[in-house]
């Protein structure tokens, strides 16, 4: 299932970006994930890199390490490098700095594709997201199948819409169950 999702994500990225490819030359793609410490982003990036290599395109990958200022600077760098498309998994979906940098990129004619999270008050050219609320529900259901009771500690990443949705799905599923605190 994850592999099929990755194939779909890469397909959407290339379908949207291929409309921008110069008649001659390579497409330039800037990619910034919120972190590369997550296996999902490592796997996604490996697949995008594989396809970019096959097509002879240039892939610029940056890791903001959960720092919105750094991600904003990376977007500005991509704009200066005249990439055709920016693929972003935003550190913070409502960050004024990130949104301002994306607006400058869009004004420069760069297409923006959001992956696995949304941006508030900004319209992207394409978005590929999973149902994060449902993912939270599934995690809670699996926990309840494996454990009859549990004391739960949730770590949050405030401002990340996808993480907030997963947590909400989890909480909504277990809230009526007194065995899970």
Task: Identify the meaning behind each predicted range.
Residues 2-14:
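Hydrophobic membrane-insertion alpha-helices, especially the h-region
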Residues 17-31:
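Ser/Thr/Pro/Gly-rich low-complexity linker/stalk segments immediately outside membranes or between
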Residues 94-134, 145:
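Flexible loop/hinge segments that line or gate small-molecule binding clefts
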Residues 48, 138-178:
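An alpha-beta-alpha
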Residues 83-92, 111-115, 153-154:
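Periplasmic-binding protein-like
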Residues 46-61, 175-180:
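Signal peptide-proximal N-terminal region
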Residues 30-46, 60-71, 77, 92-93, ...:
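Extracytoplasmic "Venus flytrap"
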């Amino acid at each position: 299932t994850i592999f099929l999702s990755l194939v779909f994500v890469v397909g959407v990225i290339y379908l949207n970006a291929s409309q921008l490819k110069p008649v001659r030359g390579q497409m330039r793609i800037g990619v910034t994930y919120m972190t590369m410490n997550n296996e999902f982003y490592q796997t996604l990036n490996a697949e995008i890199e594989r396809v970019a290599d096959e097509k002879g395109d240039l892939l610029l990958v940056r890791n903001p390490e959960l720092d919105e200022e750094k991600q904003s600077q990376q977007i500005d760098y991509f704009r200066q490098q005249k990439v055709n498309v920016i693929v972003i998994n935003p550190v913070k979906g409502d960050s004024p700095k990130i949104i301002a940098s994306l607006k400058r990129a869009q004004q420069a004619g760069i297409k923006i594709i959001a992956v696995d999270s949304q941006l508030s008050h900004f319209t992207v050219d394409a978005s590929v997201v999973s149902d994060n609320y449902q993912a939270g529900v599934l995690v809670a259901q699996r926990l309840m199948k494996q454990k009859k009771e549990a004391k739960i500690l949730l770590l949050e990443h405030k401002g990340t819409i996808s993480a907030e949705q997963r947590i909400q799905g989890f909480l909504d599923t277990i809230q009526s169950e007194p065995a899970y605190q």
